[in-house]
């Protein structure tokens, strides 16, 4: 892999928050981290702002479709929208 491999930005979760595999829905000020991984996929993780523990955004990892930065932007948009947001292009929450 070449170029940038990780993106990390703060976001305020919309109503209904974001769905994680480990703890369910989280809300409020969050940080989203997207990391390119081998095989043309990206892993999307989320944490409470300034926390230490990261959680997997439900549906992650997802295909990067050749533009992992766009997947990161889509993940931020999904979390801003809320409604138990999961990874863009990933599995829907149960």
Regions found by a protein language model. Give the residues of each.
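Negatively charged, low-complexity tracts enriched in Asp/Glu with abundant Ser/Thr
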Residues: 1-33
């Amino acid at each position: 892999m070449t170029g940038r491999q990780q993106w990390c930005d703060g976001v305020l979760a919309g109503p209904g928050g974001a769905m994680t595999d480990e703890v369910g829905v989280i809300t409020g000020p969050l940080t989203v981290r997207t990391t390119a991984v081998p095989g043309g996929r990206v892993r999307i993780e989320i944490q409470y702002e300034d926390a230490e523990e990261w959680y997997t955004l439900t549906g992650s990892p997802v295909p990067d479709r050749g533009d992992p930065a766009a997947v990161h932007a889509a993940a931020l948009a999904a979390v801003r929208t809320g409604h138990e947001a999961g990874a863009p292009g990933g599995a829907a929450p149960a």
